[in-house]
Amino acid sequence: MLISCGLPVSGGWASPALLVRFAALAEDLGYRGLWAFQRLLVGVGQEMAPVYQSVLDPMIALSYAAARTERIRLGVAVINLPYVSPVVLAKQAASLDVLSGGRFDLGLGTGWSEPEFVATGSDPNPRGRRTEEYLAVLRALWTDQVAAFDGDLYQLPPASMAPKPISPSGPPILLGGTADVALRRAGRLAAGWVSSSRASFDAIARGVQIVRRAAEESGRDPDDLRIVVRGTVQAGERSDDRPLSGDWAQIRAGAERYAQAGVTELFYDLNWDPLIGGPDADPARAADRAAEIITALAPADFTE
């Protein structure tokens, strides 16, 4: 199992200096990738976790990190596809892939925040058809010299887009979702699945099996799939319902449980630690705490 970490995009540690510092530190320590996430806004009176109160745009933050790193992969988990045109995202993703030397991974979800749907004038439904058409437009623009698409929800007149991504097939696409139909869709259509931050260990273990079974039923090799999990770390205090909690040995043991469940990449996302990614977190203290955790959990014991 590969070990990655979250990019500083939320709260106290999401500053230009700390983003560069921790991107470089993660690369030096051997982490596989850096992952960001999307949150456009929070509605007045809307109940949201502290991590969502102040969030950098993921594509811009990853571009900033790309310019200051050389080897580490750069991913977003996830962009909510109803919020942005597939043509715009195809251009952004291809540009980031080119500028990073082919290091970009694209996670896509369908969204869940009603204020964001209203503010972007979007509708997630029908989720299945929307996702499938969206993927078709992305891949056509990335791979075809002249791309065209005429769907129920998206239309693309004959057109060309350049530059193309580094990979001939475009950046790897991972799909989110927790419903069985979404899990099966990831197994059928995507490079893999990326889990929700709110998913329990049991839900993730079950999701792995559904995704793999769907891939096999579609004639794909399930061992080729990537299963990426956002790990919310609780350093210090042990909670039985949080595998990545407790002392360093307990957190590492929890990570091993994910590996045994079939997860191929786990990223420690410290944005979810309120002392690091919370809106009121002190930047200096957040940086000290994050550096301690990232250094202590460096992936020396995990290999490809």
Regions inferred by a protein language model and the residue ranges of each:
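An alpha-helical appendage that flanks or caps ligand/catalytic pockets
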Residues: E27-D28, N125-I166, S196-E304
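Internal, glycine-rich beta/alpha segment that forms the wall or movable "lid"
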Residues: L18, V42-A49, V76, P82-L189, ...
